Regions:
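Multi-pass alpha-helical transmembrane bundle typical of ion/small-solute transporters
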Residues: 1-360
Length: 360
């Protein structure tokens, strides 16, 4: 019953989105919408686990904000407005004109119009190296910050223990991210201009993570369980909310760019990735929090971070088109890590139960 209450709204939103999708483009858009929603959920399950780890520290008010205002930001901000802003920043085409290009693409799926001008899809694909550098760097920093922290519970001890020792040096994760970014920009770009834009985008991704994460740590109360109300609590909740939205943005880059392999229609992308997909990801997040899944299955958060690390590497490699990996493979990697972490957690719980069980 609890699961139905959590996912019921997502199901209602899905039905409404399917009706709008069918009215917009018939059966074809209906099918694309469902495929994009499945793509978003499969790519973002690790995102849901990380969200749950943060959301359990937030008050009921900020959880509601995440499910209401947050979903509006996900739909209209990241899945609809973000691609338009990318076209504006990289090609100098204002968002209104970019929307016109998106809604009226060339015939037969061509990447150019008869006069030789680029389509909306081509403009987005041309900006992929910068998008991949920003998102990949942000997520790689998130992964390394988790791995180099010396925590009591370790999953892949043979890797995590050495990284935790290295982490004592301080800011080692930043050094490793910068090194990875320089390697990617040096070996995966084809011109000085492209190298400069990739480096700039990657450094912006790193700075964004450091600023947002730094603010969330500075404003987070020492004991979140005692949080009730007041200015400090409000600022702490607001910062964590902002952190979740930036995190969602970084995760959405791969889905948004991957969606163009299926369609360049911004309405279908916003409905499939944003409305249906993001709503289900948020429902999964709430379900994990209410079921206390991260406390019961202690390796889940580790598996999610390893999945994030894999996604970050895949995004950075995709700066070079030859190394672009299909979204189905990307999603499968995340599922494997999270599935393995869940299985290890179950085995750990069984061993703990046997050890604590009274003897005959």
């Amino acid at each position: 019953m609890a699961a139905f209450r959590i996912f019921g709204i997502s199901l209602l939103v899905t039905v409404a989105a399917l009706v709008v999708g069918y009215a917009h483009g018939g059966v074809n858009d209906l099918f694309l919408l469902l495929v994009l929603a499945a793509l978003e959920v499969s790519l973002s399950f690790d995102n849901a686990i990380i969200n749950a780890a943060i959301l359990k520290q937030m008050s009921r008010f900020w959880r509601q904000m995440f499910l209401t205002i947050g979903i509006l930001i996900a739909v209209f901000g990241m899945r609809l407005l973000f691609p338009l802003l990318i076209v504006w920043a990289t090609a100098g085409i204002d968002p209104v004109r970019a929307m016109e290009l998106a809604l009226h693409p060339p015939a037969h799926g061509a990447l150019e119009f008869p006069d030789g001008s680029p389509s909306y899809e081509k403009l987005i694909l041309a900006a992929h190296p910068q998008i991949a550098a920003f998102g990949g760097t942000f997520l790689l920093t998130l992964f390394l910050e988790f791995i180099v922290y010396d925590r009591d519970i370790k999953w892949l001890k043979w890797i995590e223990a050495p990284f935790a020792r290295i982490g004592r040096l301080g800011q080692v994760s930043v050094v490793m991210v910068v090194a990875a970014l320089v390697l990617a920009a040096t070996h995966l770009t084809h011109s000085g201009n492209e190298r400069a834009t990739v480096l700039t985008a990657g450094l912006l991704g790193l700075v964004t993570y450091l600023v947002v994460n730094g603010l969330s740590r500075a404003l987070r109360p020492p004991d979140v369980d005692t949080v009730t109300a007041g200015k400090a609590v409000g600022m702490a909740g607001l910062t964590l909310f902002f952190y979740l939205e930036v995190l969602d943005a970084a995760f959405s880059f791969d889905g948004v760019t991957g969606a163009f392999a299926l369609t360049s229609d911004p309405i279908v992308i916003a409905l499939g990735l944003g409305l249906v997909g993001s709503m289900f990801v948020r429902s999964i997040t709430i379900f994990l929090v209410q079921q206390e899944a991260l406390d019961r299955y202690v390796y889940l958060e580790h598996g999610a971070h390893w999945a994030i690390g894999a996604l970050a590497v895949i995004m950075l490699l995709s700066i070079e088109q030859r190394f672009e990996i299909p979204e189905a493979v990307t999603a499968s990697v995340g599922v494997v890590f999270i599935g393995a972490a869940f299985g290890w957690s179950v085995l750990r719980n069984r061993r703990s139960t046997r050890v604590s069980a009274p003897g005959p």
